[in-house]
Amino acid sequence: MMMDEDVEQATLVSYSDKPRTFPDMRSKTYSPLIIRILRNLNVRALSVLLLLSFGGIFYMGARTSPIIVFVFVVCIISFMLSVYLTKWVLAKDEGPPEMVQISDAIRDGAEGFLRTQYGTISKMAFLLAFVILCIYLFRNLTPQQEASGLGRTMSAYITVAAFLLGALCSGIAGYVGMWVSVRANVRVSSAARRSAREALQIAVRAGGFSALVVVGMAVIGIAILYSTFYVWLDVDSPGSMKVTDLPLLLVGYGFGASFVALFAQLGGGIYTKGADVGADLVGKVEHGIPEDDPRNPAVIADLVGDNVGDCAARGADLFESIAAEIISAMILGGTMAQKCKIEDPSGFILFPLVVHSFDLVISSIGILSIKGTRNASVKSPVEDPMVVLQKGYSLTIILAVLTFGASTRWLLYTEQAPSAWLNFFMCGLVGIITAYVFVWISRYYTDYKYEPVRTLALASSTGHGTNIIAGVSLGLESTALPVLVISVAIISAFWLGNTSGLIDEKGNPTGGLFGTAVATMGMLSTAAYVLTMDMFGPIADNAGGIVEMSQQPESVREITDVLDAVGNTTKATTKGFAIGSAALASFLLFSAYMDEVSAFANVSFKEVDIAIPEVFIGGLLGAMLIFLFSAWACAAVGRTAQEVVNEVRRQFIERPGIMDYKEKPDYGRCVAIVASSALREMIKPGALAIISPIAVGFVFRILGYYTGQPLLGAKVVAAMLMFATVCGILMALFLNTAGGAWDNAKKYIETGALGGKGSDSHKAAVTGDTVGDPFKDTAGPSIHVLIKMLATITLVMAPIFL
């Protein structure tokens, strides 16, 4: 079927619009304010600015610890490598003009939405920062802070500054993920015309750029805060704060990162899945046109959603995970060192920063190990990209074991317990093995090479209902193995830490919680490579859409289809990895919360008795919060999808020539509808997550005051946090796995199995996929952030619960 001249030239705009312009969005490429400022500086001024910045950073590092200097050096080198990867990717050709036109439209939509979304988030962040400032100006101080002369005003400004820096870095992490994705997609599409391996290499290196920046920013942001506070407060000098108490000042950074990540994930998830579901229901089910077909008015909105939902949101999510894990481990390391009277506690406090610095090194090696194949062509057999990615991951795992052993011997050796470092190294191995097992479990339940997804696809042959039943049962079943693995990991790491030989003044073992923290670090010790695999998914998905819309040969589409299917699996495995790390990190944050309450109340706070009615109610409220949050997130996608469906149907009715390529769809209208709806819908579930723990803690604090239970508010919040974490882990596992399985069952049928595209089995699978979309890309990932944000917000707000 021939297309008219305008469609052949890929003029993806409304009739009255200029190229690369969407209604209600913007008319020129958006760049953040800091980028625009840097562009206006000449090279000499920029060089001087960078030298002064680096000089200041290294000065503070040298005043703090040689370990901090090492962290700074590694982070800066990783940033330089990320610049190299960017230049390498951008040097690749963009392909023919029709590909470039489509890519420009996607980039405009993604950047325009992110500008509006981040503008909304920044306003809420400043409002919340003001609330935190007011609370901290009237809160109590810990005895250690009072002894060091740290007043309420200084403590308030420190926490607010940390919160805003965490929010800023989290926002940049998300923007970076989107920035590279919208520029790499067309280059992957172009490379797919030549060879599958070259396309794979470009997608991986583009994802690697984003991953290195995200992890590097999380590490260097905390390191800069730590060294700044260390120098400014003159830590460890007579009459000043002890270094073991310093990590408590960093909790605002974790809360800021969580705050931005939650709204980025909610807004991006609602956008991407609202557009995806709407496009699929009308395009595939009602009109039988292929995915990413240029006749579908919602296709550009769908492709934009891949970037703002999967790239920007996931970058902020992983940034927040790493920041929360580092801060909680630093708090626990400082607490343990203080109890054990370790002469130099800096190694135990800074150990998480060193582990993630090595993560940048080993993940870079893993990323660079994936190379193109010489003399390959589009006609060559398509090598399984998952095998290639798995080789890189295996190499990264091996290097992680070696560097983890070196780190523990360097930083965790103490004469009080000479073999303790070996026990903690074993804790790290537990975490590394847990990460590998989680990745394998996620692949097993979501890859169509294995039985669960094929069984789900077979259920599609008997109708829509059986597909839904099979998908729900698969998701429920998939929670069992991960929970068993997490349980074994926590118990093993706790036991290894407890038997490390580190004891307090009374002779009690004190290394258990820190052992669990080290296991969490082990699990996240390959986070940069795992994030690379995750970023690979949406880039490959976008590349496939560009190939389809630009009417490339079927052989090219076959390559991008393979990359897309693997990308779906890597996204699913990354979500499994993320929820596993979130589970361990939340356990650490819960322990850190109890330590902080003990410090503020100056009494022991080690147990939470759920036999107390008020405490049990707190647990129920925590469990309810997870279900209500998930319901509101899914409902938001449903309402957005309804608006898209109505708009697409309207265009098909009013412009019947669309199906025959005689009229052009109004892509911009769908983009504007989805963007507006996503920004509106993200507020309610986000506000629920932030307000609930604060309100519950404050109400029960008042109740405790009148009933003679001074710690009741803190206990109820602890129960709420505990139950929400447990329910959140299970709910996220169910939602992520069921959604990923539904998606890949559809893709398995699209390979030609069970009747192939257009068959009744395929239509049933599409229905399952639309149900699973908000599960795996909106509610599920948002719960990862939610359970960690609940922990960080309780850390920051702990004083008002007492």
Curated annotation (Swiss-Prot):
InterPro entries in the record: PPase-energised_H-pump
GO MF annotation terms: diphosphate hydrolysis-driven proton transmembrane transporter activity; inorganic diphosphate phosphatase activity; metal ion binding
Transmembrane segments: 41-61, 66-86, 118-138, 160-180, 206-226, 246-266, 348-368, 386-406, 421-441, 468-491, 511-531, 577-597, 615-635, 686-706, 716-736, 782-802
Residues carrying the site annotation Important for proton transport: D310, D317, D777, K788
Binding site for Mg(2+) 4: N568, D743
Keywords, alphabetical: Golgi apparatus, Hydrogen ion transport, Ion transport, Magnesium, Membrane, Metal-binding, Translocase, Transmembrane, Transmembrane helix, Transport
EC number assigned by the record: 7.1.3.1
UniProt binding sites for Mg(2+) 2: D276, D773
Main location: Golgi
Assembly description: Monomer.
Name of the protein this chain belongs to: Pyrophosphate-energized membrane proton pump 3
Species assigned in the record: Arabidopsis thaliana
Originating gene: AVPL2
